[in-house]
């Protein structure tokens, strides 16, 4: 019997929406649980991209994108990683928008109530990303998101990594696709807003189990009061 593929998620997007931005898990510990994934860094300082077992930070700095490899000692308030194992692999040979490609990916799903890991390596006619800016906990995530820098670039090669989440888990994560991008030359990346792919290889991986961890030593998290309805609306708006 093969070993179960576990999606490891630390904390929830709902906690971020409530302003719990302090990092409480190291990147080194995170990478023990998977080689592909995403999240954010301490104080929501940019976008975390995990590709091939390495962690990168993409953020907007003085009007331009900055991508750096993250130290194992850096901490995250929220992240999700998985030991990605492609179950479906197909080649995209012609131009498609993000929505068209997402529909094609979903045509391979054998149900709608399981998580999936997503990896799209290719050449993109257009890529549009944003980065959440570093912030203090007294500003709601949805409000921070209204001033996040966005960047667009044409004719770029790179990899999209992400997680597809079933609707019933909205709040724990964001329902549907949550995707981050990093260029092959490590000069561009961020949270994917939209894109046009020219060609590439798409991989869809199964997830058998959800390993949901919580910041059990963080008193701010332990005693936080969450408005669930508002939290879900904020996730939809911000993500």
From Swiss-Prot:
Its EC number is 4.1.1.5. Coiled coil: none annotated. InterPro entries: Acetolactate_a_deCO2ase (IPR005128). Gene3D superfamilies: Hypothetical protein, similar to alpha- acetolactate decarboxylase, domain 2. One of its GO terms (biological process) is acetoin biosynthetic process. The enzyme is active only in the presence of branched-chain amino acids. Valine results in much higher activation than leucine or isoleucine. Disruption phenotype: Slower growth in media containing valine, leucine plus isoleucine, or leucine plus valine. It is an enzyme of class 4 (lyase). It catalyses: (2S)-2-acetolactate + H(+) = (R)-acetoin + CO2. Keywords: Acetoin biosynthesis, Decarboxylase, Lyase. One of its GO terms (molecular function) is acetolactate decarboxylase activity. It comes from the Bacteria. Pathway: Polyol metabolism; (R,R)-butane-2,3-diol biosynthesis; (R,R)-butane-2,3-diol from pyruvate: step 2/3. CDD domains: acetolactate_decarboxylase (cd17299). Belongs to the alpha-acetolactate decarboxylase family. NCBIfam families: acetolac_decarb (TIGR01252). Converts acetolactate into acetoin. Regulates leucine and valine biosynthesis by diverting the flux of alpha-acetolactate towards acetoin when the branched-chain amino acids are present in high concentration. This is Alpha-acetolactate decarboxylase. The lineage of its organism: Bacteria, Bacillati, Bacillota, Bacilli, Lactobacillales. The gene is aldC.
């Amino acid at each position: 019997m093969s070993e179960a593929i576990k999606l490891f998620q630390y904390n929830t997007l709902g906690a971020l929406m409530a302003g719990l931005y302090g990092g409480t898990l190291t990147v080194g510990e995170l990478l023990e649980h998977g080689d592909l994934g995403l999240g954010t860094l301490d104080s929501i300082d940019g976008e975390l991209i995990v590709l091939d077992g390495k962690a990168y930070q993409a953020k907007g700095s003085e009007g331009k994108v900055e991508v750096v490899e993250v130290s194992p000692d850096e901490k995250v308030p929220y992240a999700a990683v998985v030991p990605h194992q492609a179950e479906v692999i197909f080649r995209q040979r012609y131009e498609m928008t993000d929505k068209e490609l997402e529909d094609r990916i979903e045509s391979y799903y054998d149900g709608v109530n399981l998580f999936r890991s997503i990896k799209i390596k290719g050449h993109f006619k257009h890529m549009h990303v944003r980065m959440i800016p570093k912030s203090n906990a007294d500003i709601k995530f949805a409000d921070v998101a209204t001033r996040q820098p966005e960047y667009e670039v044409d004719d770029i090669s790179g990899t999209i990594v992400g997680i597809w989440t079933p609707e019933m888990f909205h709040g724990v994560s964001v329902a549907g696709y949550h995707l981050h991008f990093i260029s092959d030359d490590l000069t561009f990346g961020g949270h994917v807003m939209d894109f046009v792919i020219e060609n590439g290889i798409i991989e869809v991986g199964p997830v058998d189990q959800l390993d949901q961890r919580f910041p059990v030593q963080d008193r701010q998290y332990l005693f936080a009061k969450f408005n669930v309805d508002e939290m879900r609306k904020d996730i939809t708006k911000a993500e």
